[in-house]
């Protein structure tokens, strides 16, 4: 029986989850695993140094051991330097033995998966924008497979040009007056990036290759900001 571990330290606090491994894009599980098995710990106030403790608690609650984990998916950002550095290094450490494979994915690409779960539309991710706060009046945007760091004006212009059907947003984007008005006026369904199981990211195992070497995306915003 094998399981997947999901680790997200790119947003507020720490989110960590374990789910029955899915062996293919269709979602079947190997070794007679319960496909519905899923446990998570979401601690918005947690800091990086508690990640090991959180994993121990999660494994205990799940009734499994680290040896049962065969694949690990960690978000690579964009996000905070300290959070990403801790999360990526932690996952590299527990994969170093070669007993499990490490997959790194863009946080925005991972969040994009939430649209498909909410709409029951397998094509949803191709019609989805992801908008999360970078800093005041600037956002991380994923649209049509491209990721960028944009002002509110640029985000609105890109959304207007591409007209997505869905938008995965964080609380700040949800509450932004200009973005909210645009979504409402253009009939774009918004999906909050909270409260969704991380196992919805399982489809990304099929898209990405495992590697012990992962580079977190915590420097990119600095390059963009130099131009503003």
Predicted regions and their residues:
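N-terminal beta-alpha supersecondary unit
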Residues: 1-74
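Short, basic/glycine-rich phosphate-binding loops at helix/coil junctions
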Residues: 34, 92-94, 138
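DPxDG-like acidic metal-binding loop motif
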Residues: 71-102, 107
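Buried hydrophobic packing segments
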Residues: 55, 90-94, 111-115
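Oxyanion-binding and handling regions
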Residues: 1-19, 23, 106-228
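Generic recognition of short, well-ordered alpha-helical segments
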Residues: 50, 85-89, 178
